[in-house]
Amino acid sequence: MFDGIGFMELLLIGVLGLVVLGPERLPVAVRSVTSWIRAMKRMANSVKEELEQELKIEQLHADLKKAESKGLSNLSPELQESIDQLKQAAQSVNRPYQVQDVPAPENQIHNPASQSVSTEASPSASSAPTSESNQGEDTRSNPKANG
Protein backbone atom coordinates (compact mmCIF):
# COMPACT_ATOMS: atom_id res chain seq x y z
CA MET A 1 0.00 0.00 0.00
CA PHE A 2 2.80 2.39 0.85
CA ASP A 3 5.16 1.28 -1.93
CA GLY A 4 6.77 4.68 -2.60
CA ILE A 5 6.76 5.88 1.00
CA GLY A 6 9.63 5.04 3.34
CA PHE A 7 9.88 5.05 7.10
CA MET A 8 11.12 8.64 7.29
CA GLU A 9 8.16 9.92 5.25
CA LEU A 10 5.68 8.08 7.50
CA LEU A 11 7.40 9.48 10.58
CA LEU A 12 7.21 13.01 9.13
CA ILE A 13 3.46 12.57 8.39
CA GLY A 14 2.92 11.33 11.97
CA VAL A 15 4.75 14.28 13.51
CA LEU A 16 2.87 16.78 11.30
CA GLY A 17 -0.43 15.15 12.23
CA LEU A 18 0.47 15.35 15.90
CA VAL A 19 1.34 19.04 15.60
CA VAL A 20 -1.74 19.96 13.52
CA LEU A 21 -4.38 17.84 15.26
CA GLY A 22 -2.92 17.50 18.72
CA PRO A 23 -2.61 14.41 20.89
CA GLU A 24 -6.35 14.26 21.66
CA ARG A 25 -7.71 14.34 18.10
CA LEU A 26 -4.94 12.40 16.32
CA PRO A 27 -6.13 8.88 17.39
CA VAL A 28 -9.70 9.70 16.31
CA ALA A 29 -8.46 10.96 12.94
CA VAL A 30 -6.30 7.85 12.44
CA ARG A 31 -9.27 5.59 13.24
CA SER A 32 -11.56 7.41 10.82
CA VAL A 33 -8.95 7.31 8.03
CA THR A 34 -8.38 3.58 8.54
CA SER A 35 -12.13 2.93 8.53
CA TRP A 36 -12.44 4.85 5.23
CA ILE A 37 -9.60 2.81 3.75
CA ARG A 38 -11.24 -0.46 4.89
CA ALA A 39 -14.58 0.61 3.41
CA MET A 40 -12.94 1.46 0.08
CA LYS A 41 -11.12 -1.90 0.04
CA ARG A 42 -14.38 -3.76 0.77
CA MET A 43 -16.17 -1.86 -1.98
CA ALA A 44 -13.37 -2.57 -4.46
CA ASN A 45 -13.41 -6.28 -3.56
CA SER A 46 -17.19 -6.52 -3.95
CA VAL A 47 -17.03 -4.82 -7.36
CA LYS A 48 -14.22 -7.17 -8.36
CA GLU A 49 -16.25 -10.23 -7.29
CA GLU A 50 -19.34 -9.03 -9.16
CA LEU A 51 -17.32 -8.47 -12.32
CA GLU A 52 -15.74 -11.92 -12.04
CA GLN A 53 -19.18 -13.47 -11.62
CA GLU A 54 -20.55 -11.60 -14.64
CA LEU A 55 -17.56 -12.67 -16.72
CA LYS A 56 -18.09 -16.27 -15.64
CA ILE A 57 -21.75 -16.07 -16.69
CA GLU A 58 -20.77 -14.56 -20.04
CA GLN A 59 -18.22 -17.35 -20.52
CA LEU A 60 -20.91 -19.96 -19.80
CA HIS A 61 -23.22 -18.34 -22.35
CA ALA A 62 -20.43 -18.30 -24.91
CA ASP A 63 -19.68 -21.97 -24.20
CA LEU A 64 -23.35 -22.85 -24.61
CA LYS A 65 -23.59 -21.06 -27.95
CA LYS A 66 -20.38 -22.75 -29.06
CA ALA A 67 -21.80 -26.13 -28.07
CA GLU A 68 -25.03 -25.46 -29.96
CA SER A 69 -23.11 -24.55 -33.08
CA LYS A 70 -20.91 -27.68 -32.86
CA GLY A 71 -23.67 -30.01 -31.89
CA LEU A 72 -23.95 -31.66 -28.52
CA SER A 73 -22.42 -34.97 -29.58
CA ASN A 74 -18.70 -34.18 -29.89
CA LEU A 75 -17.81 -31.81 -27.07
CA SER A 76 -14.69 -31.40 -24.99
CA PRO A 77 -15.00 -32.37 -21.31
CA GLU A 78 -14.57 -28.74 -20.24
CA LEU A 79 -17.39 -27.64 -22.51
CA GLN A 80 -19.65 -30.47 -21.33
CA GLU A 81 -18.97 -29.46 -17.71
CA SER A 82 -19.84 -25.84 -18.50
CA ILE A 83 -23.10 -26.93 -20.12
CA ASP A 84 -23.98 -29.08 -17.11
CA GLN A 85 -23.29 -26.16 -14.76
CA LEU A 86 -25.46 -23.88 -16.85
CA LYS A 87 -28.30 -26.40 -16.88
CA GLN A 88 -28.09 -26.80 -13.10
CA ALA A 89 -28.15 -23.03 -12.65
CA ALA A 90 -31.20 -22.75 -14.90
CA GLN A 91 -32.99 -25.51 -12.97
CA SER A 92 -32.22 -23.90 -9.62
CA VAL A 93 -33.61 -20.59 -10.87
CA ASN A 94 -36.80 -22.19 -12.20
CA ARG A 95 -37.39 -24.47 -9.21
CA PRO A 96 -38.86 -21.87 -6.78
CA TYR A 97 -41.30 -20.65 -9.40
CA GLN A 98 -42.86 -24.00 -10.28
CA VAL A 99 -46.60 -24.10 -9.73
CA GLN A 100 -48.24 -27.14 -8.17
CA ASP A 101 -51.00 -28.68 -10.26
CA VAL A 102 -53.22 -29.74 -7.34
CA PRO A 103 -53.45 -27.42 -4.32
CA ALA A 104 -53.44 -28.98 -0.89
CA PRO A 105 -56.83 -29.04 0.92
CA GLU A 106 -55.58 -26.75 3.70
CA ASN A 107 -54.64 -24.17 1.08
CA GLN A 108 -58.12 -24.03 -0.44
CA ILE A 109 -60.29 -21.01 0.23
CA HIS A 110 -63.47 -21.62 2.21
CA ASN A 111 -66.49 -20.45 0.23
CA PRO A 112 -69.55 -20.10 2.50
CA ALA A 113 -71.84 -19.26 -0.45
CA SER A 114 -71.49 -22.79 -1.81
CA GLN A 115 -72.58 -24.27 1.54
CA SER A 116 -75.58 -21.96 2.08
CA VAL A 117 -77.74 -24.06 -0.22
CA SER A 118 -77.13 -27.18 1.84
CA THR A 119 -77.73 -25.46 5.21
CA GLU A 120 -81.08 -24.00 4.16
CA ALA A 121 -82.54 -27.45 3.58
CA SER A 122 -81.15 -28.96 6.78
CA PRO A 123 -83.60 -29.48 9.66
CA SER A 124 -81.19 -28.00 12.23
CA ALA A 125 -81.47 -24.58 10.61
CA SER A 126 -85.28 -24.52 11.09
CA SER A 127 -85.05 -25.48 14.78
CA ALA A 128 -82.94 -22.43 15.66
CA PRO A 129 -84.65 -20.09 18.17
CA THR A 130 -86.09 -16.91 16.76
CA SER A 131 -86.89 -13.63 18.46
CA GLU A 132 -90.59 -14.58 18.51
CA SER A 133 -89.92 -17.72 20.56
CA ASN A 134 -87.89 -15.69 23.09
CA GLN A 135 -90.85 -13.39 23.83
CA GLY A 136 -92.52 -15.96 26.01
CA GLU A 137 -89.61 -16.03 28.53
CA ASP A 138 -90.12 -15.08 32.12
CA THR A 139 -89.44 -11.38 32.62
CA ARG A 140 -88.47 -11.79 36.28
CA SER A 141 -84.92 -12.81 35.31
CA ASN A 142 -84.50 -9.63 33.24
CA PRO A 143 -84.62 -6.50 35.45
CA LYS A 144 -85.08 -4.13 32.49
CA ALA A 145 -88.18 -5.99 31.36
CA ASN A 146 -89.73 -5.51 34.81
CA GLY A 147 -89.37 -1.73 34.67
From Swiss-Prot:
UniProt-listed Pfam families: TatA_B_E (PF02416)
Location, primary (coarse class): membrane
Example of a GO cellular component annotation carried by this entry: TAT protein transport complex
InterPro entries linked: TatA/B/E (IPR003369), TatB (IPR018448)
Disulfide bonds: none
Chain segments carrying region Disordered: 85-147
Record's function text: Part of the twin-arginine translocation (Tat) system that transports large folded proteins containing a characteristic twin-arginine motif in their signal peptide across membranes. Together with TatC, TatB is part of a receptor directly interacting with Tat signal peptides. TatB may form an oligomeric binding site that transiently accommodates folded Tat precursor proteins before their translocation.
Protein name: Sec-independent protein translocase protein TatB
Naturally occurring in which organism (per UniProt): Shewanella sp. (strain ANA-3)
Gene assigned in the entry: tatB
